[in-house]
Amino acid sequence: MEHNIGNNAELIEAKTIANDSFLPTANDWEKIQDAEQIIKKAKDLLDYFLDQYPEVKRIGLTGQMHGIVYVDKAGRCVSPLYTWQDGRGSLPEDNSISLVEEIQQKCQVKAASGYGMVTHIYNLRHYLIPDVAVGFCTIMDYFGMYLTGRKRALIHASNAAGFGFFDGRHMCFMKEELGKIGIQGKWLPEVCGAMQELGTYRNRIVTTAIGDNQASFFGAAGNENSTLLVNIGTGGQISVLSDQYFAEDGIEARPFWDGKYLLVGASLCGGKAYALLEEFFRKLIKQATGQDKPLYGILETMARKGKETNASRLENRKLKVTTTFNGTRANPETSGSITNLFADNFTPEAFTYGVLEGMVLELYQMYQIIRTGTYIQVTRMIGSGNGLRKNPVLCEIIEEIFGIKLILAEYEEEAATGAAISSTLLKSIERTK
């Protein structure tokens, strides 16, 4: 819940509830969630705030990007949520190459597994789409439909771009390229570049949903150029706001608003690398002692010691960890690695520090690509995500590697904050329904 005061936003109340919506599946690569359960929880949360704060006039929306749900002609959800983590696009097809590779070869378009359009193409080929489905959208766009009674999705360009096959320069889907791989335009949702009104819910205006990346940036850093946002949670991401459109291997130009772009680099593992390390040590402790307790406090102590010890070593004697344990968006088959192992650095402290450093270096390499290609001079660096808030050593490593002071975002729920403020960007109350 945000209260807008001039150009500032004051956080009145934040509320977090468990998602717990993943559906069991026989396929390790399949990551799907119960869409209706998500919608019910979101509605209950919204109703709570509207009951508590009846003065609310507008409702802004955001949610997880890239994933899709299918809807029927009445605007009802008829499928699970296929999430951004879904791996069907990386599976070998009959021609022994993955769908992602085929898209690159046939369409010269780079799209990762988990992107909505990749998921849709796979589902279409494998007859996995419900017969009554007439289109698809993100889960937050469906929530907007649910609240306002819309029968057809209207999605902001920030979400459309997350599907893949989207021309960020001209703010439209690449219909010619989609045609090369057999996708008809009838499946595509309507796209808008500016905030629009979807309709109303309980007499409040509901605005178009925005991507969680854009919402997080807006909530944490505002809309100033030359600002770098570093987010580390289960994943890892850097975002720089720019007037320039710039896209390279591993770097996306995601639509923002007012003609700006978020230049984004994302690591697939990110904070998960640290979680894997904690899980590794926890299994060892459980095997030795029978105890199964979180070890993040101990890891922080070891990371601190590892950092101090590492500072006194020669560069060629420092243990190095590459944390691409889940591959990269550009190359899903890339593996992680541990190098520069010597007898004197074969320690849990060095491993712990090495994982944290590896997480940061992967993001820093992406930042270097952006800086070299755009000549952007970053003057402010904002940090967000629990991976940073709960790990002072990681924050120090980021400052040292990037060479910029790190300021933690004022509010923890950056995406929700940005979504709430985004509703104030609506310039017209004309119905788009």
Which ranges hold each PLM region?
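Short, basic and Ser/Thr-rich N-terminal targeting/leader segments
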Residues: 1, 55, 62-64, 116, ...
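N-terminal glycine/serine-rich phosphate-binding loop of ATP-dependent small-molecule kinases
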Residues: 1-79, 105, 132, 179, ...
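Proline-centered turn/helix-capping motifs that create local helix->coil transitions or kinks
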Residues: 8, 185-186, 329-331
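Short clusters of small/polar residues that mark proteolytic maturation junctions
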Residues: 15-16, 82, 243, 266
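Short beta-strand-loop/turn "lid" adjacent to the catalytic site in phosphate-handling enzymes
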Residues: 29, 51-83, 109-114, 144-168, ...
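Carbohydrate-associated surface elements
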Residues: 86
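Active-site core segments that coordinate phosphate-bearing ligands/cofactors
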Residues: 90, 95-110, 118-152, 164-175, ...
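A conserved helix-loop-beta module that forms one wall/lid of the active-site cleft
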Residues: 178-196
